[in-house]
Amino acid sequence: MNLASMLPFLDEEGLQILVDGLIDGSLTDISLGEILHFLEDEQIKELYNHYAAHPEKGVSTTIFFPFMDDDDVDKEFLRQFADGKINNEMLPFVSDEALHSIVEQYVANPDWNLDIDDLYPFLDDDDLTLLLKAYLKHKSSAN
């Protein structure tokens, strides 16, 4: 039996059985890449949370980002940011609003020792200008 061929025909209950099997380790003959397209947002979040909490399982959480709900991506990115980490792998999937929030926090604390250079390609023009103005203001006040 080829589980991947069955995926498009499974209902939510069947997909949840597969999710549970991936989490408890009893299901090893299907990959996350095969199943993620078919899952509901909550199931994707459940799998993401499981693998994020168990890095020893060797699953890169990057695989989840294209499939996660936009709000969930933003929440996770902002949570990691609050812990002092910028997850570069998430950047293409983070909303402009979440990035703007980070820029505002960064500008409000110019002495923050956090490297945000990797954000530049993902920021809109207004946020880049805001960063530039804050940098120039901080630089002139330091002199």
Where are these regions (language model features)?
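General marker for long, soluble alpha-helical cores
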Residues: 1-143
